[in-house]
Amino acid sequence: MSVIVKEYSSKLIERFTQEKCRLSKLLPTDIKIEHVGSSAVFIGGKNIIDILIGVPKRKDMISIKNILTKNGYFEGSDNHEDRIFLANTKEETGEGDFHVHICPIKEESYENFIILRDFLKNNPEKAQEYLKKNTNLQKKLILIAKNTKP
């Protein structure tokens, strides 16, 4: 499947807000729901809405995954010890799909999503560079962002 980069649309923010509201009703109150990825920093991309769900402890990831799979999400193959990936479609459609990343709040994987999002929001020129070189640049920008934290 070829990757099609689309222009940014404010409808992605609306869709995130609606899905966050729906998820908030399904999930425990001690979790965090954050908008991350290119749509969170107002740049184009694959028209995917990345949602970061922060859980208090690593052991909580499975229960959140189970709730989401019972409510329309599919487990993806890009899982790690400190992150579970789910999507609301089995294959990317480019029509505002949701990708959910479940991570423990106090672990590096969670912090990296937040650091990268905030760095790109505050550095529009880097955000455009990120859009062009997404995969290779992501790790580099996380390191830069960590070194420029106040």
Say what each PLM segment does.
Residues 1, 47-51, 96-98, 116:
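Short amphipathic alpha-helical segments
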Residues 1-34:
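Helical scaffold of the NTase/Pol beta-like nucleotidyltransferase catalytic core
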Residues 5-11, 52-53, 116-120:
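Short histidine-centered catalytic/ligand-binding loop motif
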Residues 23-60:
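Active-site nucleotide-donor binding segment shared across nucleotidyl transfer reactions
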Residues 63-71:
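Short amphipathic alpha-helices in soluble, non-transmembrane regions
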Residues 71-107:
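Conserved catalytic core of two-metal-ion nucleotidyltransferases
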Residues 108-150:
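Catalytic cores of NTP-dependent nucleotidyl/adenyl transfer enzymes across multiple folds
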